[in-house]
Regions:
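Alpha-helical segment proximal to the catalytic Tyr-Lys
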Residues: 129, 172-177
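Short, small/polar-rich loop/turn modules that mediate ligand/substrate recognition or access, typified
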Residues: 82, 176-180, 235-237
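Residue(s) in the substrate-gating loop at a strand-loop-helix junction
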Residues: 144
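Substrate-binding pocket helix/loop in short-chain dehydrogenase/reductase
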Residues: 97-110, 206
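C-terminal substrate-recognition "lid" of short-chain dehydrogenase/reductases
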Residues: 124, 217-242, 247
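Conserved glycine-rich cofactor-binding loop
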Residues: 13-14
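Active-site helix of classical SDR
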Residues: 124, 160, 168
């Protein structure tokens, strides 16, 4: 069995996932870096994590594929024999105006729900036997305020995150006390994902009226994920909003 604690962060090639991988490595964890298509970026994350002194297991897996998820967790088990923290960060969306109902095809619905909703469930189900025997088994789902207030990149994305918030509560009841399950709900994140549709100026204007008038950074979310994993032992089934006070 691996001597160090182990964290698996899905979708950790870039952005919030990469920030989480580095943050846990700084805390002495060895890291499972998961990616679906972004191998070049995942290798960059691997190098950054290794620079913190951590060991890295790099695994390609589309979390919407249940069999692939089972294989990923099987590899973690065979290589390291433990898993202490699961961060369900992998996500996808399409930027579709909510009024454009006809643009939201069944194919888009299936892809978004597959990655954002089914994927976290598949990962928890596959990893539960490892998390149960950890001294502090923890699942943190990276959700969104879109799942709370219905404002987001598409109707399907909002629905997927609302579902993830509910799954968080259901699994917290089902898996406690051995495993805690919580969600972090960011607002707008200053990342390349959002910058596909917003300039820096537009993002600054969007957040200018918030009580804390700036967008979240990947490190803000990583710090929250770390807190929910290690900084509290009595919180489960909770949605922790990190959006500068927009959502109250």
């Amino acid at each position: 069995m691996n001597e160090n604690n182990v964290a698996l962060i899905t979708g950790s090639a870039t952005g919030v996932g990469r920030a989480c991988a580095i943050r846990f490595a700084e805390e002495g964890f060895d890291i499972v870096v998961n990616y679906s298509r972004s191998k070049t970026e995942a290798l960059e994350t691997k190098s950054l994590v290794e620079a913190e002194g951590a060991k890295v297991l790099l695994i390609q897996c589309d979390v919407s594929d249940d069999a692939a998820v089972q294989a990923m967790i099987g590899e973690v088990s065979s290589e390291w024999g433990r898993l202490d923290v699961l961060v369900n960060n992998a996500g996808t969306t399409e930027f579709i105006d909510h009024k454009e109902l006809d643009e939201l095809s069944e194919e888009i619905w299936d892809r978004i729900l597959g990655v954002n909703l089914k994927g976290p469930f598949f990962c928890v189900r596959a990893a539960a036997h490892l998390l149960r025997v950890s001294e502090f088994g923890s699942v943190v789902n990276v959700s969104s305020t879109a799942g709370i207030d219905g404002r987001g990149s598409s109707v399907a994305y909002c629905a997927s995150k609302a579902g993830l918030n509910t799954i968080t509560k259901s699994l917290a009841r089902a898996l406690g006390p051995e495993i805690r399950v919580n969600s972090v709900c960011p607002g707008p994140i200053d990342s390349r994902w959002l910058k596909r549709v917003m300039t820096d100026e537009q993002l600054a204007e969007e957040t200018s009226g918030y009580p804390i008038p700036r967008p979240s950074l990947p490190d803000d979310i990583a710090d929250t994920v770390l807190y929910l994993s290690l900084g509290t032992t009595l919180s489960t089934g909770q949605l922790l909003v990190v959006d500068g006070g927009r959502t109250m």
